[in-house]
C-alpha cells in the first residue's frame, strides 16, 4: 500500500481529493446577498486552482488554523502541517455552512479593490457595455476592465503585457499571497482574464430598495417583522400610499430657510427641551430644603464677612437672585465688580481650608441628586451636547479657569437656577478639587508664592495702565463670564421677545432652560466683543464697562489696541468715545470671515448699523447658505465633537516654553531702545473657530527700587522675588499662549529696525520628518490685518506680517470607547491626556533648539543692534538656554523658559544663574512625579443619536450661526493635511484671500474642497427608505424585548382559547375562537423570526439594499455570433436599474422635485427594476420583455430549477469514475451494502483492474490488459470481486439537500442493470422505488476512501444532522405489519358464500326464536343449529368472545385473515356508522334486526338493543389487544 500511495495517490489533482489540512472558505453569492463561511477542517482542494472551483461564489483562502494550536505560539506552520499529515485525530471535525445577511459595506467590500496609487474601483457608474465599433469595454460600465479585470491574460487596456515569473505563477496557483501589479496608465490589473468570471461589481443605489425575497415570499418576512399586512407593506414600498410618519421625517430633511424670528426660534427649541416639566416634581420636593440651605448660606456669608475670613465679593453677590433685585443702581454694581484682592491676605493653609470646606458643601449639596436625576434627564433630552458648550470656551478665555480654579475654586455663583448644573462643569472643566489643593500645598514652602495667585488677567477691554496705576493690587477675575453674559443676553433677548416684562432680573425656570440652550447661540455671536449691546440695554453691563474702562493713568499716555468688532468696523469706532481719545482702535479683519466671505452678504459685512440691529439678520444670511456651508465643512460629520480647554497648574505655567524665542539674538522682537513694549497675543480656539478673540498689548512693569538701589546689588532671594512678583505675571501669559495648540508670533517694525519676518509667499507646510509633529505656517499680508504704532517713521512704516504656527500631534485623539473611562478618571483625580505635554515640548525642543534660525526670523540680528551693557554681553547666552541644551542631550522633556527683567533706566537684561539652577531641577523632578496638567485639547466623544433628525438639524443650526467659526482647523489639519507631502519642497498652502478652493492642495485636501452639497448623504423617506428608518429601531436589545413580550403573550392567548372553547355556545363565539387561532399562528410565526434575529444579533436593516451586486461579466456575456450580437438578459436588467437610478438622483438634486410625486414615481420605477432583476414579473410588477414580447430571464430563473445554475452546472456536472442507474429495492441486503450491476462495475473499476493486472504481470501493456479482460470473463469476474472488496462507492441522489444525500456503501455484484438499495436507507436520500435514479462515484485516493469508511458509511449516518433525530427507522416495516394484521382480503369471497348458504336453507333466520329468561334477557342459541351452519374449514363461525377466537387461531383451526363473527355489546368504530343498512328484518312478535355489511344488531319490540354480532378477523383482534395493553401500560 505504501508504494501504491507514493506512485499514484500522493499528489492527486482531482475534484474529490481530501487532506487533513483545514482551510477556511468564505464565499459570497451576489443574488442572495448572503455570506457563506465554510469551515472544513478535513477537506480542501489540494492543488486545484481556486478559480476553477467557484462560479458564483468568491472564495478567499486563509492560513490554515487548528483550534487546538491557537493557544501555542511555538508551533511553526511547517510543524503544524507535519502534524496534520501524520494521521487523524479528534481535532478533525466538520463544521457546517453558516449563512447570514450581507451588509451594504460587505457587498461593497466584495467588489472594491484599491490600487497602489490610492484609486478605488468597483462601482459601476454607467450603463454602457462595449463600444459599437472597437468592441472595447466602456470605462465604468458593465464590462469595465478596471472593475472586472482584463480581457486577455496579463494584458491591460493599453495593450501592454506583463506576465508574472514562473515563481510568482506558482505562488498564485498555490494560493500564496503575492503582490498585484497594475498598469500605471490605464489602472488595469495584470492578471488572468478568467478573473472576469469571479470579480463582482456593485451599483450604489441613490435610494434604498427592498429585496424582493423578503417581502413577496410566503411568508413575507418584512410583513412579519413589522406586523403589517403584506398589501399595506407593498403599497409603502411602491409609493402608492403615504404613511403619517413620512411627512414628519420629510420635514426634518428640509434644509431650506429656517424661521429666523426670535419667537419662532424660542418656540422651536421649546419643543425639544421639556426639562421644565420633569423638574417640577424635584422642585416641589426640594423647595423647602433649598430655602433652608439658602438661609444657612446667607448666615455663613455674613459670619465669614464679620470674621474677615473672606471678602464679600467672593460670594458673587451679583448673581444672587435676591441681591440683584434690590441693587439696581450703577454704584452698587460697579462696587460688586471691583477686584477681589482680599483673598491674598490669607495664608496658604487658610485658603486650602476654605477651598476644601466649600467644595465639600457643594459636593454634598449637588452631587447625589445631580447624578441620579438631572444627569439622566439631560441625556434623555439631548442636553449632553448642549451642555458641552458650557465647558472651557464659553468662559471666553483660556486663562479664566486657571485663575478661577486657584482663587475661588468652587465659588462660582450662588444663584439657585445655576447651581443645579454645577457638578457637571466641576467634572468636565475643573477636574478634581483635591488635585488643586495638593498643587497649592506643594508651594507652601516657597517664598512669595502669593504672587502666583496674582497673575494679572486682562478683562475683555482693559486699559494697559492698570499695571502701572494699580501695580500693588492683585487683580482677579471679576465674575464667571459665561453665565454673566448668558444672563445678560437672555435679559436682552426676552426683552425683545416680550416688552411687557419689567423685572428681568428674576428668570423663570423655563427662561433659564432656554438660556442654557442658547449657550452656543451666545458663543457664536461673540458677545464679549460686542458689549455695547448690553450697555444700551442693561445697567449691569454698563457698570461693567465703567469698572474696566475707567482705570487710567493720565500721566502716562499709552495706547491700547483692541480687536476689531466681529461684524463692523463702525461699531468699535463708535465705541471710541467711551474710552480715552488718545487710544487707537485697530481694525483686524477676521481670518475666518475672510475665508467664508463668499457665504455671507456683502451688505451685512459692510453695514454701518449696530450689532443690535443686525443680530438676527445674520440668521437669515446664514440660513440661506446653510447647505453650502455644511457641505464645505464636511469633516464635521467625521470628527468627534471637540472642545478645547487650555489650562495648567501652578508649578508648570512657567515651563510652557518656546525656548528659542528668548535667545539674545531674537530678543529684538520684544525689546526696544527707547521704550520697552512687549506685544503678545493670546489665541483661543472655540469649538469651530479660527479667529482671534483678543489682541492685547502689555507694558512691562517698570521696576523702580524705592531706595534707588541698582538691581545688580540685590541678593539672590530678592532677585528671585523680583522675578516672580513683577515680570513673571505678564510674561507667563505670553509663554502659555505659545504652549497652546495654535500660537501667534507678532512682529513689529520699530525705528531703525529691519523687518524680521520672512517673505509672505514662503509660507506653507514645514514638515520635520524625524519628529512626531507637523507645523503649518501661514502668512497674512494685508495692511488691515495688523495695527501699527503711529510713532513709527513714515518711511519705515511697512506692512506688518504675522505668521501662524499650528502644532499638530500625530497621536490619536480620544476615542469614543474611552470617553466613559475619562469621566471616571477625572473623578479619580486624574486627567487623561490625548497627547501629553511631554511629547509636545520634546517636539518643540527638537524643532527650535537647533543653532540655525527659526523660519520666522530669517535675518539675523547682531548684538550691536541692542544697547547692551558688559554684564549683559556676558550673559548673551543665558544659563537657562544652556540648561535646556543639557536636558535635550539627556532626552528629558520639560524645559524652562527665559525670563528677563526690565528697568526704566535702560534695556539691561539680567539672567539669574546662581540661585535658579538647583531650584529648576527640583521643579522638574516635581513635575515628573506629580503634575496636574490638562492638555490643550479636550475631545468629547460625540456618540449620541437623536431620535429625530430635526433635532440634529437644529443642533447644527444653533451651533453654527456663523459658519466661518463652524470649521475646526486644528482637527481639520490633523485629519486632512498631516499626510500631505509635496515631493518638491514639502510645502502646502492653506487658503487664499478670497477663494478658499482656488489654491492647489494634495489629493485628500482637494477632494475636501471640491466636495459639494450633492455629495451630502440624504435619507429618502419614500418607499424602502421608510422601512429602513423603521428597521433602525429594531436594535438587538429591542428585538430581545419584543421576543420576551411575545413569549409572555403566547400563553395568555392559549389560556384564552381554552376558556372560549369551554364556554362556546353561539356562532359568534366560534368566529372569535377562529380569530384567536389566527392571532396565535401569527404570534408563533413572528416569535420564531424575532428569536432568530435576536439570538444571532443580526441587523434587520441589511434586508434593505443600498448597494446592488453586479455579477461578473463572464456570467452575463455579450458575444459576436455570425455577425450578430448575442447578449445575456441580465445586462438589460442592470442597464434599466442604472438608468432609473440616475433619474432618481436627478430628481433628488432638484429642490423642486425632491419632495414631490415625481421622486416617488422614480423610486417606484427603481424598486420595480431591482425586483425584475431578482425575479422578473413577480407579483403585480410588469415583467421585462424582449422585442418578441417574451419575458427576460432574471437571476431567479437562472438559478432555480433543474435547468438552473446550481443543479444543471454545479451539481449536475459530468465527472469521471461515475455512473447512473435506476434504483430498486433490495431487502436482502445489509444496511451498508448496495447492489452494483456487473456491467457498470466493470466500467467503473477498469483502471483498478488494469493496474492490478500490470502489477501482477498478467499482461505487459494496457492494451494487453484490456484484451485479457474481454477474452476471459471468469478471470474478469474474479479480479473484479477482488478489487471491489476494499473500495467503497458513493451513492448520490439529486437533489442533494443535505450531507446525507452522499453516502458510502460496500458494492455487491449483481445481475441486471439496476442498482439495489436497502429500503431503510431511502429516507436519507428522500428516495423511493418508483423510477428514481442514483449516481455512483468512486473515491480514488486512500484519504478519500478512509473518510468514506469513517464518515460517510450508511451505518455511521443513523441520525439526522439537522434535528438529531433518527433518520433510519423501520417505519415501512411497521406499517406493513399493521396492514398485514388488519387485512380483510377474504371479505368479498365470504359474503358471496354466506348468501349462497342462506338461500339453500330457505330461511333467513337459521336460529330459533329467542327466549327471555327473567331480567337477564339472555339470548340463547340452540346447539343443534351449529351443525347446519357448519362450513368446510370452519370458514363461517360464531364465537362468544375474543378469547375463543384466539384459542381457535392457536389451534390453527383458523388463520389471521379468516372472517369470524363474534358477539360484542360494546362500542365499535366501523368508520361507516351512518351508512344505509343492507337489510332490515321484522319478526311477528315485533322484534327486528338491522343487518350491516360488518355487523348485525338485534332489537326487541320496544326498540331496545338485545345483541350485536360483529364480523372481524383474528389479526384485527390481536391488534386490538396490543393497543389496549399499550394504553394500560
UniProtKB/Swiss-Prot annotation:
Compartments, record wording: Plastid, Chloroplast
Keyword presence, Transcription: yes
Enzyme Commission code(s) on record: 2.7.7.6
Enzyme class: transferase
Family recorded in the similarity comment: Belongs to the RNA polymerase beta' chain family. RpoC1 subfamily.
Cellular component terms per the entry's GO annotation: chloroplast; DNA-directed RNA polymerase complex; mitochondrion
Keywords tagged on the record: Chloroplast, DNA-directed RNA polymerase, Magnesium, Metal-binding, Nucleotidyltransferase, Plastid, Transcription, Transferase, Zinc
Keyword Aminoacyl-tRNA synthetase found: no
InterPro entries referenced in this protein's UniProt entry, alphabetically: DNA-dir_RpoC_beta_prime, RNA_pol_asu, RNA_pol_N, RNA_pol_Rpb1_1, RNA_pol_Rpb1_3_sf, RNA_pol_Rpb1_clamp_domain, RNApol_RpoC1
Binding annotation for Zn(2+): 156, 158, 183, 186
SMART domains in UniProt: RPOLA_N (SM00663)
Binding, Mg(2+): 1328, 1330, 1332
GO biological process, one term: DNA-templated transcription
SUPFAM superfamilies named in the record: beta and beta-prime subunits of DNA dependent RNA-polymerase
Catalysed reactions, semicolon-separated: RNA(n) + a ribonucleoside 5'-triphosphate = RNA(n+1) + diphosphate
Cofactor notes: Binds 1 Mg(2+) ion per subunit. Binds 1 Zn(2+) ion per subunit.
Subunit structure, as described in the record: In plastids the minimal PEP RNA polymerase catalytic core is composed of four subunits: alpha, beta, beta', and beta''. When a (nuclear-encoded) sigma factor is associated with the core the holoenzyme is formed, which can initiate transcription.
Cofactor: Mg(2+); Zn(2+)
Protein name (Swiss-Prot/TrEMBL): DNA-directed RNA polymerase subunit beta'
Pfam families, per the entry: RNA_pol_Rpb1_1 (PF04997), RNA_pol_Rpb1_2 (PF00623)
Function: DNA-dependent RNA polymerase catalyzes the transcription of DNA into RNA using the four ribonucleoside triphosphates as substrates.
High-level lineage: Eukaryota, Viridiplantae, Chlorophyta, core chlorophytes, Chlorophyceae
Molecular function, one GO term: zinc ion binding
Main location: plastid
